[in-house]
Regions:
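Conserved, mostly hydrophobic/aromatic
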Residues: 48, 95, 107-109, 140, ...
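Short, solvent-exposed turn/loop segments enriched in Gly/Ser/Thr/Pro and often Arg
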Residues: 106-114, 156-157, 290-300
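Acidic/aromatic-lined carbohydrate-recognition and catalytic surfaces
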Residues: 236, 249-327
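Solvent-exposed beta-hairpin/edge-strand motifs
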Residues: 205-219
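Alpha-amylase-like alpha-glycosidases and glucanotransferases acting on alpha-linked glucans and related
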Residues: 1-99, 160-162, 257, 300-327
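Active-site-proximal helices and loops of the catalytic beta/alpha 8
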Residues: 1-45, 113-139, 143-148, 168-172, ...
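C-terminal beta-strand-rich structural cap/linker in extracellular carbohydrate-active enzymes
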Residues: 224-250
Length: 327
């Protein structure tokens, strides 16, 4: 059970530590665990041994002289509950996009509250579930399940400053961090823990994306220009950017000089054999062509030299074709 992970996240979200300290602590975890362990850690934010995560994130205060009956019945005021829910959305998203195995303590996904044992182990609140919070969990779980890069992709912290924490999850060239075949995917996860301040960010992403990135939570798209993407991160919000730049399929073609075509005279010509070869390429589904001029287009227009590569080359003439064509 990855309690250090839990402590790092809660301290950062509550403002007990800044992003720089959170970065150092996350990297300490990353460096001290073997890769296989780091990617298999049980990443939790709620537990049967701790105060309910909603109660913590709502900053509920407990008085040591408070009667146990009041502790048992305590519920966050509405504004504190709303704050706790927004914060929990951030933590849950962090769980689902971070290396490791996310663990959800029953009831956290529907907003259950409670102080320490036994108040954190109450019956499930059937009929009183927070449906909006539950839908958020369903959404981010679906995002994780649909994208291998969020499970076995590489992990790199891109920025950690003040209220902002950003990392990437990437699978390139069809191979994940364990050297296993996996679907390519590029993601950038951006957190703003501030309760009031929005941030205008310019992210340097030259090695991550060269085209278009899309927030998988809102479908809002961002263009990458000169290796940078500009965006605004609202208070208590998260953005999950996915690279959606169109991927061009690899294609093959044939680059060949006409003289390389077979001929009874030992050298190919621009004649019947060339026409038949072009017909063959078309029937074979070839779609890449290189067209070279047979006359001089201009002083510097040839793809090979300052004068046409073919113009005036009588060796390319097919005399049988000339006779057949009565030329």
């Amino acid at each position: 059970m990855n309690y250090p992970f839990r402590r790092i996240l809660i301290d950062f979200i509550l403002g007990h530590s800044d992003a720089k300290l959170a970065q150092r602590l996350v990297l300490s975890l990353y460096e001290n665990y073997p890769l296989e362990n780091f990617y298999a850690m049980m990443n939790l934010v709620g537990s049967h041994d701790e105060v309910r995560i909603m109660t913590i994130l709502g900053e509920a205060q407990i008085n040591e002289f408070m009667p146990d009956t009041e502790i048992a019945d305590y519920q966050l005021p509405l504004e504190q509950y709303k704050l706790a829910m927004q914060r929990l959305k951030l933590l849950a998203t962090w769980q689902m996009t971070f290396p490791g195995v996310p663990s959800i303590y029953y009831g956290d996904e529907v907003g259950m509250q409670g102080y320490k044992d036994p108040h954190n182990r109450g019956s499930f609140i059937w009929g009183n579930e927070d449906k909006k919070l539950l839908e958020w969990y369903k959404q981010i779980i679906a995002v994780r399940n649909a994208n291998p890069a969020l499970r076995t992709g590489s992990f790199k912290i891109l920025q950690a400053e003040d209220d902002i924490f950003i990392y990437s999850r990437v699978i390139n060239q069809g191979i994940d961090v364990f050297g296993q075949p996996a679907e390519n995917g590029i993601f950038i996860v951006i957190f703003n823990r501030s309760k009031s301040e929005k941030y205008e960010l310019t992210l340097e992403v030259p090695e991550i994306s060269v085209g278009i990135m899309e927030d998988v939570l809102t479908s809002c798209q961002y263009s990458v220009s000169f290796g940078q993407v500009n965006l605004i991160v609202e208070p208590l919000s998260v953005i999950i950017l996915q690279d959606v730049t169109p991927q061009y399929q690899k294609k093959a073609g044939i680059l060949m000089h006409p003289t390389s075509l077979p001929s009874a005279y030992g050298q190919g010509t621009v004649g019947r054999a060339a026409y038949e070869f072009i017909d063959f390429l078309e029937k074979a589904g070839q779609s890449l062509w290189q067209i070279l001029p047979l006359n001089i287009p201009d002083n510097v227009g040839s793809p090979y030299q300052s004068v046409s590569a073919f113009a005036g080359n009588v060796n390319l003439l097919d005399f049988e074709e000339l006779i057949t064509s009565q030329l």
